[in-house]
Amino acid sequence: MKMKFYKKYLLLIVAVLFIYSCDSSSTSSYSVDNGDDNMGGGSNNTELPTGFSKFISEYTDVYVSGNYVVVESTGVPNHSSPYWGAGHPNYATPHSGMSVNPNVISAQNFKFYIPLNPSISGSVSSTPLGPIGVSISGVPFFNQYAGPNNQPLDNEIPSFDYYYGHPQQTGQYHYHWEPRYLTTNDSSMLIGYSLDGFPIYGPTEQSNDQYPSNLDELNGHSHSTDEYQEGTYHYHATSTSPYLLGGFRGKYGSLNGGGYYTN
Protein backbone atom coordinates (compact mmCIF):
# COMPACT_ATOMS: atom_id res chain seq x y z
CA MET A 1 0.00 0.00 0.00
CA LYS A 2 2.77 2.43 0.89
CA MET A 3 4.59 1.76 -2.39
CA LYS A 4 1.42 2.49 -4.43
CA PHE A 5 0.92 5.74 -2.50
CA TYR A 6 4.50 6.88 -3.13
CA LYS A 7 4.25 6.06 -6.85
CA LYS A 8 1.03 8.08 -7.21
CA TYR A 9 2.59 10.97 -5.27
CA LEU A 10 5.72 10.92 -7.43
CA LEU A 11 3.67 10.92 -10.65
CA LEU A 12 1.67 13.90 -9.38
CA ILE A 13 4.86 15.91 -8.70
CA VAL A 14 6.25 15.11 -12.18
CA ALA A 15 3.00 16.22 -13.82
CA VAL A 16 2.97 19.54 -11.93
CA LEU A 17 6.60 20.25 -12.83
CA PHE A 18 5.94 19.50 -16.50
CA ILE A 19 2.97 21.88 -16.65
CA TYR A 20 4.94 24.65 -14.90
CA SER A 21 7.95 24.29 -17.18
CA CYS A 22 5.79 24.53 -20.32
CA ASP A 23 3.98 27.55 -18.95
CA SER A 24 7.15 29.55 -18.22
CA SER A 25 9.11 28.94 -21.42
CA SER A 26 10.39 31.97 -23.38
CA THR A 27 9.78 32.52 -27.11
CA SER A 28 11.90 35.63 -27.70
CA SER A 29 14.98 35.13 -29.90
CA TYR A 30 16.01 38.62 -30.93
CA SER A 31 17.10 41.89 -29.38
CA VAL A 32 13.98 43.66 -28.13
CA ASP A 33 13.71 46.39 -25.53
CA ASN A 34 10.75 46.91 -23.21
CA GLY A 35 10.10 50.39 -24.49
CA ASP A 36 11.53 52.18 -21.46
CA ASP A 37 12.90 54.94 -23.69
CA ASN A 38 9.49 56.67 -23.72
CA MET A 39 9.54 56.89 -27.48
CA GLY A 40 6.15 55.32 -28.07
CA GLY A 41 4.51 52.01 -27.34
CA GLY A 42 4.19 49.05 -29.62
CA SER A 43 4.73 45.35 -29.68
CA ASN A 44 7.96 44.02 -28.23
CA ASN A 45 7.64 40.86 -30.32
CA THR A 46 8.89 42.68 -33.39
CA GLU A 47 11.82 41.44 -35.43
CA LEU A 48 14.42 43.82 -36.79
CA PRO A 49 13.90 44.71 -40.47
CA THR A 50 16.34 42.78 -42.66
CA GLY A 51 18.43 45.80 -43.62
CA PHE A 52 19.47 46.45 -40.03
CA SER A 53 21.34 43.15 -39.96
CA LYS A 54 23.96 44.89 -42.12
CA PHE A 55 25.10 47.12 -39.25
CA ILE A 56 28.61 46.28 -38.06
CA SER A 57 28.16 44.83 -34.57
CA GLU A 58 31.65 45.80 -33.44
CA TYR A 59 30.70 49.47 -33.77
CA THR A 60 26.93 49.50 -33.19
CA ASP A 61 24.20 48.10 -30.96
CA VAL A 62 20.88 47.75 -32.80
CA TYR A 63 17.55 46.76 -31.24
CA VAL A 64 13.80 47.36 -31.35
CA SER A 65 12.19 49.60 -28.74
CA GLY A 66 8.48 50.26 -29.13
CA ASN A 67 7.87 51.85 -32.53
CA TYR A 68 11.56 52.40 -33.20
CA VAL A 69 14.73 50.70 -34.23
CA VAL A 70 17.40 52.13 -31.94
CA VAL A 71 21.00 52.32 -33.15
CA GLU A 72 23.59 53.08 -30.49
CA SER A 73 27.14 54.00 -31.44
CA THR A 74 30.16 56.06 -30.44
CA GLY A 75 30.31 57.49 -33.96
CA VAL A 76 34.01 56.75 -34.44
CA PRO A 77 35.01 55.49 -37.91
CA ASN A 78 36.19 51.94 -38.56
CA HIS A 79 39.06 53.16 -40.72
CA SER A 80 42.19 55.30 -40.66
CA SER A 81 42.15 59.10 -40.85
CA PRO A 82 44.44 62.06 -40.15
CA TYR A 83 41.77 63.17 -37.68
CA TRP A 84 42.68 60.47 -35.18
CA GLY A 85 45.71 62.57 -34.30
CA ALA A 86 49.40 61.71 -34.53
CA GLY A 87 50.31 58.72 -32.38
CA HIS A 88 46.92 57.02 -32.63
CA PRO A 89 47.05 53.49 -34.15
CA ASN A 90 44.55 54.54 -36.84
CA TYR A 91 46.30 57.77 -37.73
CA ALA A 92 46.98 58.28 -41.44
CA THR A 93 48.97 61.05 -43.07
CA PRO A 94 46.83 63.54 -45.04
CA HIS A 95 46.38 62.73 -48.70
CA SER A 96 47.62 65.08 -51.39
CA GLY A 97 45.63 68.31 -51.54
CA MET A 98 43.87 67.74 -48.22
CA SER A 99 43.37 70.74 -45.93
CA VAL A 100 43.14 69.24 -42.44
CA ASN A 101 40.79 71.05 -40.07
CA PRO A 102 41.89 71.54 -36.42
CA ASN A 103 39.43 69.03 -34.94
CA VAL A 104 40.19 65.54 -33.61
CA ILE A 105 37.91 62.49 -33.60
CA SER A 106 36.22 61.96 -30.24
CA ALA A 107 33.89 59.16 -29.13
CA GLN A 108 30.27 60.24 -28.72
CA ASN A 109 27.18 58.71 -27.16
CA PHE A 110 24.72 58.47 -30.04
CA LYS A 111 21.29 56.89 -29.84
CA PHE A 112 19.40 57.09 -33.13
CA TYR A 113 15.64 56.49 -32.97
CA ILE A 114 14.55 55.34 -36.42
CA PRO A 115 10.89 54.55 -37.23
CA LEU A 116 10.34 50.80 -37.32
CA ASN A 117 7.67 51.14 -40.01
CA PRO A 118 8.61 54.17 -42.14
CA SER A 119 5.93 55.86 -44.19
CA ILE A 120 5.85 58.57 -46.85
CA SER A 121 4.81 61.91 -45.40
CA GLY A 122 2.40 64.32 -47.03
CA SER A 123 5.17 66.91 -47.27
CA VAL A 124 8.95 66.98 -47.38
CA SER A 125 10.83 68.04 -44.23
CA SER A 126 14.13 69.89 -44.36
CA THR A 127 17.09 68.17 -42.77
CA PRO A 128 18.69 69.97 -39.81
CA LEU A 129 22.39 70.59 -39.26
CA GLY A 130 23.99 67.72 -37.39
CA PRO A 131 23.15 64.02 -37.68
CA ILE A 132 20.36 63.18 -40.15
CA GLY A 133 21.01 59.45 -40.30
CA VAL A 134 23.56 56.79 -39.48
CA SER A 135 25.88 54.58 -41.52
CA ILE A 136 26.15 50.83 -40.93
CA SER A 137 29.44 51.50 -39.12
CA GLY A 138 27.74 53.88 -36.67
CA VAL A 139 29.19 57.09 -38.11
CA PRO A 140 26.48 59.76 -38.53
CA PHE A 141 25.45 61.30 -41.82
CA PHE A 142 25.21 65.10 -42.10
CA ASN A 143 23.33 67.04 -44.77
CA GLN A 144 24.66 68.93 -47.80
CA TYR A 145 25.31 72.20 -45.98
CA ALA A 146 28.36 73.52 -44.14
CA GLY A 147 26.42 75.73 -41.71
CA PRO A 148 23.31 77.85 -41.08
CA ASN A 149 21.41 79.52 -43.92
CA ASN A 150 22.29 76.73 -46.33
CA GLN A 151 25.98 77.54 -46.57
CA PRO A 152 27.37 75.48 -49.47
CA LEU A 153 29.73 72.66 -48.64
CA ASP A 154 32.35 73.69 -51.21
CA ASN A 155 34.83 75.17 -48.73
CA GLU A 156 34.68 72.12 -46.46
CA ILE A 157 35.23 69.48 -49.12
CA PRO A 158 39.05 69.91 -49.13
CA SER A 159 39.03 68.95 -45.43
CA PHE A 160 37.50 65.51 -46.12
CA ASP A 161 39.87 62.63 -45.45
CA TYR A 162 40.49 59.84 -47.96
CA TYR A 163 37.19 58.19 -47.01
CA TYR A 164 35.17 61.43 -47.34
CA GLY A 165 34.67 62.19 -43.65
CA HIS A 166 35.82 64.75 -41.10
CA PRO A 167 35.03 65.82 -37.50
CA GLN A 168 33.32 69.01 -36.37
CA GLN A 169 34.28 71.15 -33.35
CA THR A 170 33.24 68.65 -30.64
CA GLY A 171 34.95 65.74 -32.40
CA GLN A 172 31.85 64.29 -34.08
CA TYR A 173 33.22 62.49 -37.11
CA HIS A 174 30.66 62.37 -39.93
CA TYR A 175 30.02 61.93 -43.63
CA HIS A 176 28.34 64.47 -45.91
CA TRP A 177 29.11 62.24 -48.87
CA GLU A 178 29.20 58.57 -49.80
CA PRO A 179 31.29 56.77 -47.14
CA ARG A 180 34.07 55.58 -49.40
CA TYR A 181 35.43 53.02 -46.96
CA LEU A 182 32.14 51.12 -47.13
CA THR A 183 31.56 51.34 -50.89
CA THR A 184 35.08 50.67 -52.19
CA ASN A 185 34.24 47.05 -53.02
CA ASP A 186 30.51 47.45 -53.63
CA SER A 187 29.14 50.79 -54.79
CA SER A 188 25.54 49.53 -54.66
CA MET A 189 25.49 48.34 -51.05
CA LEU A 190 23.21 49.55 -48.28
CA ILE A 191 25.30 52.15 -46.44
CA GLY A 192 22.90 53.19 -43.68
CA TYR A 193 19.55 54.72 -42.81
CA SER A 194 18.02 58.16 -42.76
CA LEU A 195 16.28 59.26 -39.55
CA ASP A 196 12.98 58.86 -41.40
CA GLY A 197 13.56 55.10 -41.55
CA PHE A 198 14.28 54.80 -45.26
CA PRO A 199 17.51 53.07 -46.33
CA ILE A 200 20.40 54.82 -48.05
CA TYR A 201 22.37 53.01 -50.75
CA GLY A 202 25.61 53.65 -52.56
CA PRO A 203 25.64 55.48 -55.90
CA THR A 204 24.75 52.50 -58.13
CA GLU A 205 21.83 50.09 -58.39
CA GLN A 206 22.14 46.56 -57.00
CA SER A 207 20.39 45.09 -60.04
CA ASN A 208 22.80 46.32 -62.72
CA ASP A 209 25.60 48.39 -61.12
CA GLN A 210 24.42 51.41 -63.11
CA TYR A 211 23.78 54.90 -61.77
CA PRO A 212 20.04 55.51 -61.29
CA SER A 213 18.51 57.93 -63.77
CA ASN A 214 15.19 58.60 -62.08
CA LEU A 215 16.04 59.99 -58.64
CA ASP A 216 13.72 62.65 -57.26
CA GLU A 217 14.88 65.98 -55.81
CA LEU A 218 15.76 64.26 -52.52
CA ASN A 219 18.00 61.62 -54.15
CA GLY A 220 15.35 58.93 -53.77
CA HIS A 221 13.09 56.57 -55.67
CA SER A 222 11.18 53.32 -55.06
CA HIS A 223 11.79 49.73 -56.16
CA SER A 224 12.87 46.39 -54.72
CA THR A 225 16.36 45.89 -53.32
CA ASP A 226 18.22 42.90 -51.92
CA GLU A 227 17.11 43.87 -48.42
CA TYR A 228 13.56 44.90 -49.38
CA GLN A 229 12.28 42.37 -51.90
CA GLU A 230 8.78 43.85 -51.92
CA GLY A 231 10.13 47.31 -52.68
CA THR A 232 10.70 50.45 -50.65
CA TYR A 233 11.48 54.12 -51.03
CA HIS A 234 15.21 54.68 -50.57
CA TYR A 235 17.96 57.22 -51.14
CA HIS A 236 21.18 56.97 -53.15
CA ALA A 237 24.51 58.69 -52.58
CA THR A 238 25.45 60.98 -55.47
CA SER A 239 28.49 63.03 -56.45
CA THR A 240 26.46 66.24 -56.62
CA SER A 241 24.30 68.04 -54.06
CA PRO A 242 22.39 66.91 -52.03
CA TYR A 243 24.95 64.04 -51.92
CA LEU A 244 22.98 61.74 -49.56
CA LEU A 245 19.44 63.06 -49.12
CA GLY A 246 17.94 66.46 -49.78
CA GLY A 247 15.21 66.20 -47.15
CA PHE A 248 13.13 63.70 -45.22
CA ARG A 249 10.57 61.97 -47.44
CA GLY A 250 9.04 60.27 -44.42
CA LYS A 251 8.09 61.01 -40.83
CA TYR A 252 11.35 61.13 -38.97
CA GLY A 253 12.59 60.02 -35.58
CA SER A 254 15.29 61.64 -33.51
CA LEU A 255 18.75 61.58 -32.05
CA ASN A 256 19.01 60.65 -28.35
CA GLY A 257 15.25 60.55 -27.83
CA GLY A 258 14.45 64.14 -28.68
CA GLY A 259 10.95 63.49 -29.98
CA TYR A 260 9.01 62.10 -32.90
CA TYR A 261 7.78 64.42 -35.60
CA THR A 262 4.65 63.72 -37.61
CA ASN A 263 4.78 66.51 -40.19
Language-model features and meaning:
Residues 215-263:
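Long, compositionally biased interface segments
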Residues 103-105, 158-171, 218-231:
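Short, low-complexity cationic-aromatic patches
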Residues 18-21:
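C-terminal motif of bacterial Sec signal peptides marking the signal peptidase cleavage site
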Residues 25-154:
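Solvent-exposed N-terminal domain segments of exported/luminal and surface proteins
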Residues 122, 141, 181-186, 200, ...:
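Short loop/beta submotifs within extracellular cysteine-rich repeat domains
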Residues 2-10:
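Bacterial N-terminal signal peptides that target proteins for export
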Residues 153-163, 168-211:
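Short helix-loop boundary/capping segments
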Residues 110, 114, 135-140, 169-181, ...:
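Extracellular/lumenal glycan-associated surfaces
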